Regions:
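Membrane-embedded helix bundles of polyisoprenyl
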Residues: 2-84, 100-120, 125, 186-187, ...
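Structural signature of transmembrane alpha-helix termini at the membrane-water interface
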Residues: 15-19, 41-44, 61, 79-87, ...
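Transmembrane alpha-helical segments
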Residues: 32-44, 72-80, 162-165, 212-227, ...
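Contiguous transmembrane helix-bundle modules in multi-pass membrane proteins
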Residues: 66, 175-188, 195-317
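Periplasmic/ER-lumenal interhelical loops and adjacent helix-loop junctions
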Residues: 93-208, 249-255, 312, 316, ...
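Short periplasmic/luminal acceptor-recognition loop of GT-C membrane glycosyltransferases, typified by
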Residues: 323-336
Length: 336
């Protein structure tokens, strides 16, 4: 039941469905990333260690843009698995095992340099002519719900994710606490997003590879609720405070505020009803409704340009840009 529920949640995450028809390049690497996570499990069990390099290499060759964040997600999951199998970890053992694991990822990067190096050269050579500007105020840490919830250019889950992160941060399990802290830092520190984007801009779409890690915390919390190991009242209060902080900190729209309120009401209602009657299907229905709300909002929030308004053939701006690029000897890039 837990595996089915998580599969449903993963399928209905906002970026997965949206980009499957909008920007396939934002999610086409996901199969290799998931296979990489499975290979990491085998790696720390002493099985087929070469598979980590293989799946990381294929992920990099599939999507160069998500190379940094994809490798970062694999590294975080590697530390998570290492902490899980080592009950008494030491710094010396961590350095030894971490170096051996990092070598597998570095080898994948070296193999993929045939694609990464030309792309990196293009990014660096065209940077001076770019028009991207990052305000220092955007680096101020805060509760940015856009990095986690509803948005199709981010992890794009529901408030249960916030509940899961909070639960993980206060968990007694070292590996789970580590993952919760990592997800919390990613969601509150824009400079991390800026670095994962190659210092180009602060755009949360680079966090999409962390979706499976969010699902992992999702599963831990779901399983704890089923076993009755969570104190829901304090978690509900903290989740509400975090949601309110996100609303007031980033001045969200009325529509987003409505979805946050609806999400919170549905989530808390299903949790407390489940605690009374102990029927697992109630919890599943509540989470499914939250995900459906999130996915529907994310997909309908995108405004497409009507075909009748496009002016590719007669656009003076397009012709001017094409003439300028053609007159330059160095490689150029444009913002999309």
């Amino acid at each position: 039941n837990t595996a089915f529920a998580l599969s449903f949640v993963f399928l209905f995450s906002a970026p997965l469905i949206f980009h499957s028809h909008r920007h396939i390049m934002f999610v086409n690497y996901m199969p290799f990333l998931l296979l990489g996570f499975m290979a990491i499990e085998d790696y720390f069990e002493g099985k087929r260690k070469y598979m980590v390099t293989l799946w990381a290499f294929l992920m990099l060759m599939t999507s160069y843009f998500f190379a940094v964040s994809g490798l970062a997600a694999m590294a975080v999951y590697g530390v998570y698995r290492w902490l899980k199998i080592n009950e008494k970890p030491t710094f010396k053992k961590f350095c030894k095992d971490g170096t051996a694991f990092a070598f597998r990822l570095i080898l994948a990067v070296i193999m993929a340099c045939v694609l990464i190096l030309p792309t990196l050269h293009c990014m660096l050579s065209g940077r001076e002519a770019g028009n991207s500007h990052v305000d220092l105020k955007s680096f101020i840490p805060g509760v940015n719900l856009k990095f986690l919830l509803y948005y199709h250019y981010s992890i794009g889950l529901c408030l249960f994710t916030v509940l899961s992160i909070i639960s993980a941060v206060f968990s007694k399990q070292r590996y789970r606490r580590f993952l919760g802290i990592v997800m919390m830092v990613i969601a509150t520190c824009p400079i991390i997003v800026y670095m994962l984007n190659g210092t180009l801009y602060v755009d949360p779409k680079v966090l999409i590879p962390f979706l499976p890690l969010g699902m992992l915390l999702f599963g831990h919390t779901y399983f704890d609720i089923i076993r009755g190991k969570l104190k829901l009242k304090p978690l509900a209060v903290i989740t509400l405070l975090v949601a309110l902080a996100g609303v007031f900190w980033f001045k969200t729209t009325k529509k987003v505020e409505f979805y946050i309120i609806l999400d919170f009401v549905v989530l808390m209602s299903s949790l407390f009803v489940y605690r009374r009657c102990k029927k697992e299907f109630i919890l599943n229905i509540g989470m499914s409704l939250c995900l459906v709300v999130s996915t529907v909002y994310a997909n309908f929030a995108d405004e497409l340009v009507p075909l009748s308004e496009l002016e590719y053939d007669n656009s003076s701006d397009m012709n001017t840009l094409a003439d300028y690029v053609g007159s330059q000897e160095e490689i150029s890039r444009t913002s999309n």
